UniProtKB/Swiss-Prot annotation:
Protein name: Large-conductance mechanosensitive channel
Cited function: Channel that opens in response to stretch forces in the membrane lipid bilayer. May participate in the regulation of osmotic pressure changes within the cell.
GO cellular component: plasma membrane
One family name in Pfam for this protein: MscL
Transmembrane keyword on record: yes
Length: 139
Protein backbone atom coordinates (compact mmCIF):
# COMPACT_ATOMS: atom_id res chain seq x y z
CA UNK A 1 0.00 0.00 0.00
CA UNK A 2 2.88 2.36 0.80
CA UNK A 3 4.44 1.66 -2.62
CA UNK A 4 1.16 2.48 -4.34
CA UNK A 5 0.85 5.74 -2.42
CA UNK A 6 4.47 6.63 -3.21
CA UNK A 7 3.88 5.93 -6.92
CA UNK A 8 0.74 8.07 -6.81
CA UNK A 9 2.40 10.93 -4.93
CA UNK A 10 5.42 11.01 -7.21
CA UNK A 11 3.45 11.15 -10.43
CA UNK A 12 4.12 14.33 -12.36
CA UNK A 13 0.60 15.71 -12.04
CA UNK A 14 0.47 15.43 -8.25
CA UNK A 15 3.87 17.06 -7.76
CA UNK A 16 3.00 19.82 -10.24
CA UNK A 17 -0.29 20.42 -8.44
CA UNK A 18 1.47 20.64 -5.07
CA UNK A 19 3.96 23.17 -6.44
CA UNK A 20 1.07 25.15 -7.93
CA UNK A 21 -0.79 25.22 -4.62
CA UNK A 22 2.29 26.42 -2.74
CA UNK A 23 3.06 29.13 -5.29
CA UNK A 24 -0.63 30.07 -5.39
CA UNK A 25 -0.70 30.55 -1.62
CA UNK A 26 2.39 32.75 -1.77
CA UNK A 27 0.91 34.71 -4.67
CA UNK A 28 -2.31 35.15 -2.68
CA UNK A 29 -0.35 36.68 0.19
CA UNK A 30 1.37 39.08 -2.22
CA UNK A 31 -1.94 40.11 -3.78
CA UNK A 32 -3.52 40.60 -0.33
CA UNK A 33 -0.66 42.89 0.66
CA UNK A 34 -0.91 44.70 -2.68
CA UNK A 35 -4.62 45.33 -2.15
CA UNK A 36 -4.49 46.15 1.57
CA UNK A 37 -1.26 48.15 1.61
CA UNK A 38 -0.87 49.67 -1.87
CA UNK A 39 -4.17 49.91 -3.77
CA UNK A 40 -6.84 50.54 -1.14
CA UNK A 41 -5.09 53.30 0.88
CA UNK A 42 -4.93 55.75 -2.08
CA UNK A 43 -8.51 54.89 -3.04
CA UNK A 44 -9.57 55.48 0.56
CA UNK A 45 -7.67 58.78 0.57
CA UNK A 46 -9.44 59.89 -2.61
CA UNK A 47 -12.78 59.01 -1.01
CA UNK A 48 -12.11 61.06 2.11
CA UNK A 49 -9.76 59.03 4.32
CA UNK A 50 -11.88 55.88 4.21
CA UNK A 51 -10.25 52.74 5.60
CA UNK A 52 -12.08 49.99 3.74
CA UNK A 53 -11.03 47.32 6.23
CA UNK A 54 -13.01 49.16 8.94
CA UNK A 55 -16.24 49.71 7.01
CA UNK A 56 -18.93 47.74 8.78
CA UNK A 57 -22.52 47.84 9.92
CA UNK A 58 -23.44 46.85 13.47
CA UNK A 59 -26.29 44.35 13.29
CA UNK A 60 -26.48 43.83 17.05
CA UNK A 61 -24.75 45.86 19.75
CA UNK A 62 -22.21 44.20 21.97
CA UNK A 63 -23.01 43.41 25.57
CA UNK A 64 -19.71 44.68 26.92
CA UNK A 65 -19.25 48.10 25.27
CA UNK A 66 -21.86 50.40 23.75
CA UNK A 67 -21.46 51.73 20.19
CA UNK A 68 -19.98 53.50 18.31
CA UNK A 69 -17.05 51.19 17.71
CA UNK A 70 -13.78 52.49 16.26
CA UNK A 71 -13.03 49.37 14.25
CA UNK A 72 -14.31 45.95 13.31
CA UNK A 73 -11.95 44.42 15.85
CA UNK A 74 -13.28 46.69 18.61
CA UNK A 75 -16.88 45.85 17.72
CA UNK A 76 -16.20 42.14 17.68
CA UNK A 77 -14.24 42.35 20.93
CA UNK A 78 -17.28 44.01 22.49
CA UNK A 79 -19.43 41.12 21.32
CA UNK A 80 -21.22 43.04 18.57
CA UNK A 81 -22.50 41.28 15.48
CA UNK A 82 -21.16 43.09 12.41
CA UNK A 83 -21.59 43.04 8.65
CA UNK A 84 -18.05 43.70 7.38
CA UNK A 85 -18.66 45.04 3.89
CA UNK A 86 -15.28 46.83 3.76
CA UNK A 87 -13.43 43.54 4.13
CA UNK A 88 -15.69 42.14 1.42
CA UNK A 89 -14.71 45.01 -0.91
CA UNK A 90 -11.04 44.22 -0.23
CA UNK A 91 -11.67 40.54 -1.00
CA UNK A 92 -13.43 41.41 -4.27
CA UNK A 93 -10.51 43.60 -5.35
CA UNK A 94 -8.06 40.81 -4.43
CA UNK A 95 -10.09 38.26 -6.37
CA UNK A 96 -10.25 40.54 -9.40
CA UNK A 97 -6.48 40.97 -9.40
CA UNK A 98 -5.86 37.23 -9.04
CA UNK A 99 -8.42 36.40 -11.75
CA UNK A 100 -6.84 38.92 -14.12
CA UNK A 101 -3.34 37.59 -13.40
CA UNK A 102 -4.50 34.02 -14.08
CA UNK A 103 -6.17 35.22 -17.29
CA UNK A 104 -2.91 36.84 -18.44
CA UNK A 105 -0.95 33.70 -17.54
CA UNK A 106 -3.31 31.39 -19.43
CA UNK A 107 -3.33 33.77 -22.39
CA UNK A 108 0.49 33.78 -22.49
CA UNK A 109 0.63 29.98 -22.22
CA UNK A 110 -1.86 29.62 -25.07
CA UNK A 111 0.24 31.93 -27.26
CA UNK A 112 3.38 29.93 -26.48
CA UNK A 113 1.79 26.66 -27.47
CA UNK A 114 2.78 25.86 -31.02
CA UNK A 115 -0.26 25.82 -33.18
CA UNK A 116 -0.35 22.59 -35.10
CA UNK A 117 -0.61 23.20 -38.81
CA UNK A 118 -3.89 22.09 -40.24
CA UNK A 119 -3.73 18.78 -42.03
CA UNK A 120 -3.87 19.23 -45.77
CA UNK A 121 -7.32 18.65 -47.08
CA UNK A 122 -7.63 15.23 -48.65
CA UNK A 123 -9.12 15.38 -52.10
CA UNK A 124 -11.97 12.89 -52.52
CA UNK A 125 -11.18 9.91 -54.73
CA UNK A 126 -13.86 10.71 -57.29
CA UNK A 127 -12.39 14.19 -57.82
CA UNK A 128 -8.93 12.66 -58.30
CA UNK A 129 -10.35 10.26 -60.90
CA UNK A 130 -12.15 13.07 -62.71
CA UNK A 131 -8.93 15.10 -62.84
CA UNK A 132 -7.04 12.12 -64.24
CA UNK A 133 -9.72 11.66 -66.92
CA UNK A 134 -9.57 15.37 -67.75
CA UNK A 135 -5.79 15.30 -68.03
CA UNK A 136 -5.94 12.17 -70.20
CA UNK A 137 -8.47 13.81 -72.53
CA UNK A 138 -6.26 16.89 -72.90
CA UNK A 139 -3.47 14.71 -74.32
Amino acid sequence: MFKEFKAFAMRGNVVDMAVGIIIGAAFGAIVKSLVDDVIMPPIGLLLGNVDFSNLFIVLKDGAEVAPPYASVAAAQAAGAVTLNYGLFINAVVSFTIVAFAVFLLIRAINKLKAEEPAAPEVTPEDIVLLREIRDALKK
